[in-house]
């Protein structure tokens, strides 16, 4: 069944809200820099270029790019993170999303926003464990701050 434009737009809005909440939560965390990294920033330009097979393969890799790069300012480690909104989290769907990301970005992680909370895992681990994702835990992002951001999610995204 083809998704209507309204349904597609609705899902796009939910995804953007999830990205904004994630970005703000990390931005507020001392010791980390968050950078927009997703394909939305460059694919439109690339799509206008002449397309060879190599170019198409490259565009596909860029299309799968995670949404953010997070830099730990102390260790200089970089974590690539794809953010998804899921009303209902199922291991089968999480694994499918992780597999798609892993095709081009093996070291990326997945952050899921849902009405019940936030979830996080490395895509390679999610593929290996059948898509079972754990609740998000970060030593520098207290539970009360997560609850505040979750309340925003639930304010703007009504239950389906």
Where do the PLM segments sit?
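Short secondary-structure junctions
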Residues: 27-34
């Amino acid at each position: 069944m083809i998704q209507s434009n309204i349904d597609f737009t609705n899902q796009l809005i939910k995804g953007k809200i999830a990205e904004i909440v994630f970005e703000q939560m990390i931005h507020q965390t001392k010791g980390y820099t968050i950078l927009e990294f997703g394909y939305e920033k460059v694919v439109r330009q690339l799509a206008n270029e002449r397309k060879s097979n190599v170019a198409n393969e490259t565009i596909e890799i860029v299309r799968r790019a995670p949404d953010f790069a997070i830099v730990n300012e102390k260790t200089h480690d970089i974590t690539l993170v794809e953010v998804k909104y899921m009303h209902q989290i199922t291991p089968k769907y999480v694994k499918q999303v992780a597999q798609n990301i892993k095709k081009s970005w093996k070291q990326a992680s997945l952050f899921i926003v849902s009405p019940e909370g936030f979830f996080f895992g490395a895509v390679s681990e999610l593929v290996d464990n059948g898509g079972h994702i754990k609740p998000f835990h970060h030593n520098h992002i207290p539970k009360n701050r997560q609850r505040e951001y979750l309340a925003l999610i639930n304010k703007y995204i009504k239950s389906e």
